[in-house]
Amino acid sequence: MDNIRRVGEIYQCPVMITEVGFEVDESRPEVLAEGKRQLLRVLRESKSETNGICRGVFYLEPECRPSQYRLGAFTEDVHPTIIMEAFSEMR
């Protein structure tokens, strides 16, 4: 989060983290769990370690199928994976 703070301070503006994504492999639940853990870490750190400079986190293409883009957050039959739970856990 040092870079987020640095960019905000240099340009005197709020910053967003854009285009995050984590691997979706429906056959490996541990991969999905790790994606959720990492997204939750990014969300928490962006809120607690940026002195209010970070205004949000944008997940790139969460609804795409893994066969189209491996870093989405939905299953092949277009249902959300546990990765998306990270957003609701931040409320």
Model feature map: region roles:
Residues 16-21, 58-60:
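A cross-family glycoside hydrolase active-site/sugar-binding cleft signature
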Residues 6-9, 25-91:
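Aromatic-rich peripheral "rim/lid" segments of glycoside hydrolase catalytic domains that contact
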Residues 2-15:
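Active-site neighborhood of glycoside hydrolase catalytic domains
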